[in-house]
Amino acid sequence: MIELFSANTPNGWKISIMLEEIGCEYKVTKVDLGKDEQFKPEFIKLSPFGKIPVIIDHGNNESIFESGAILMYLGHKSGKFYDEKDRLNINQWLMAQMGTVGPMIGQHHQFHHYNPGKSEFGEERYFKITKRIYGELDARLKESKFLAGPEYTIADIAT
């Protein structure tokens, strides 16, 4: 049984999607970000930076934090959506999501939805970056059925 510590955010949804896709039994423990539950000492033991999601695989007492690492773990464990022969390409697209797509679009969301008008520089910068990212993703999907190739993978789930 997998225990998923999560909140209603894109990073949390990724793991729920993966668990559903692989047909894994799991339970969700909600982490209330509005009440700063992610910064409680017992949660920091699971996730040193106080970020969701986290899973505990109660079958082997493994605890994994960071959505990309969790997707890799679940893909490897289940044998689904993380094929050995395509692993390098899958990892490249997964890391692009973790390092560029997610953080940059997240910044755009912060400036445009939570703090509009507070930083013209931030709003313009992240709007341009987000527009470019969507353009690159569209270009990739014109040449490939899925991000990492012809098959649905954890890179698609992450993005």
Task: List each model region and its residues.
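A glycine-rich, coil/turn loop motif that links secondary-structure elements
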Residues: 146-153
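GST-like domain detector, emphasizing the conserved glutathione-binding G-site
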Residues: 1-125, 131, 138, 145
